[in-house]
Amino acid sequence: MYYGFDVGGTKIEFGAFNEKLERVATERVPTPTEDYQLLLDTIAGLVKKYDNEFSCEGKIGLGLPGMEDADDGTMLVVNVPASTGKPLRKDLEALIGRSVKIENDANCFALSEAWDDELKDEPSVAGLILGTGFGGGLVYEGKVFSGRNHVAGELGHMRLPLDAWFHLGDNAPLLGCGCGKKGCLDSYLSGRGFELIYEHYFGEKKKAIEIIQAYNEGESKAAEHVDRFMELLAICFANLFTGLDPHVVALGGGLSNFELIYEEMPKRIPKYLLSVAKCPKIIKAKHGDSGGVRGAAFLNIK
């Protein structure tokens, strides 16, 4: 049995999956964001409950909006401050008495998609999230590739490529990022970035859904903005694809529901790739909000 925990700033979602990777149990509980011992006890309590229910010792995986220090095992999780600076994995292993795997939630999203029936035979899958922020995860041969420092999928903190600056023109917005730097992809390719770029060029604050609705109604400013954003997205995706060369790319997050992306990217990306390279297949993620808990559980698939 595979146990997955999607640990967020408000709730912990638990899922149990059998050997056929079918979900057989679900539970949601509030996240103890400020009390570390209560956080440990909450996770351990769910493990014990479902061990008893299924008469087994499930394999445990956690996905969190943060990362584990590769050297000392301490966590950096902004939305769950109780765990920041603490060796969460080691403490859980000591409390539960078995191995625990921890990954960034974007990597779990990518892993969930990579183990979908239609993608599980693909050698490599990139999962890219166009949500409140922009991030991603890399899966090679069915396993998350997180790198030496566990930051291999932190694509949102790569900077805009030169072609993107030229495309945005002399009046290009220099947007700050929560990491403290400027020019991160997170600030441009996210739903938030979609809105900020519109505001920069037109001096109006609008929600992404309002801009897209205006585009669908043929409004000229929205059309100009969407064309600018699609080209920006193509440039940045091509830059990422040149380095990662994934076989398939699955898009998640709110902005991934903008169907025009799937029409425009295959047409716009190729001119920014090497002449021998082809644009990978780009699809909408299938598993939505359940991707985090699925991917966390699947961290233990051999």
From Swiss-Prot:
EC number: 2.7.1.59
Domain of life: Bacteria
Pathway annotation from the record: Cell wall biogenesis; peptidoglycan recycling
Binding locations of Zn(2+): H157, C177, C179, C184
Residue runs in coiled coils: none
Catalytic activity annotation: N-acetyl-D-glucosamine + ATP = N-acetyl-D-glucosamine 6-phosphate + ADP + H(+)
Binding locations of ATP: 4-11, 133-140
CDD domains: ASKHA_NBD_ROK_NAGK
Keywords: ATP-binding, Carbohydrate metabolism, Kinase, Metal-binding, Nucleotide-binding, Transferase, Zinc
Xref: Pfam families: ROK
UniProt xrefs under NCBIfam families: PRK13310.1
Record's function text: Catalyzes the phosphorylation of N-acetyl-D-glucosamine (GlcNAc) derived from cell-wall degradation, yielding GlcNAc-6-P.
Stored PANTHER family: N-ACETYL-D-GLUCOSAMINE KINASE (PTHR18964:SF162), ROK (REPRESSOR, ORF, KINASE) FAMILY (PTHR18964)
Assigned protein family: Belongs to the ROK (NagC/XylR) family. NagK subfamily.
Name listed for the protein in its UniProt record: N-acetyl-D-glucosamine kinase
Gene source species: Vibrio atlanticus (strain LGP32) (Vibrio splendidus (strain Mel32))
Gene: nagK
